[in-house]
């Protein structure tokens, strides 16, 4: 299992396909390991002559868990506070997670990659595209958050109740 020892920690990743092919970086959502990407999806990308890179984000899968960074709020409560536009003290930001991926691209000696993000992985991908646009060949968002604040609040309330 390959690991990248980056400035910010140890990250597990996998590479599928020929090194010479254009790269697609798959970013999974909150707390989900890269192993959650369906093998059939990865196979489909390989059949399209693409090189596929999956990575476990911070605090997910086999990557380093940042338990030394303390927070006093649960994830559902933080989501609720964010939706209500209240301040949230987070141990790290989406920008930090995007910069982890920049370091991974550097480690793999890739100037650019097509980026596919699922759920929060899409938010990380959007952040990556906004802070390092030259590193993103294209951006595809899957399972994106709700389009309206009202719908997001309804979903958050349902999540907290269950």
Model-derived regions, located:
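The alpha/beta-hydrolase serine catalytic core
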Residues: 154-162
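Structured loop/turn residues at beta-strand edges in well-structured enzyme cores
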Residues: 19, 48, 99, 108-111, ...
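Conserved acidic catalytic loop of the alpha/beta-hydrolase fold
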Residues: 82-85, 91-113
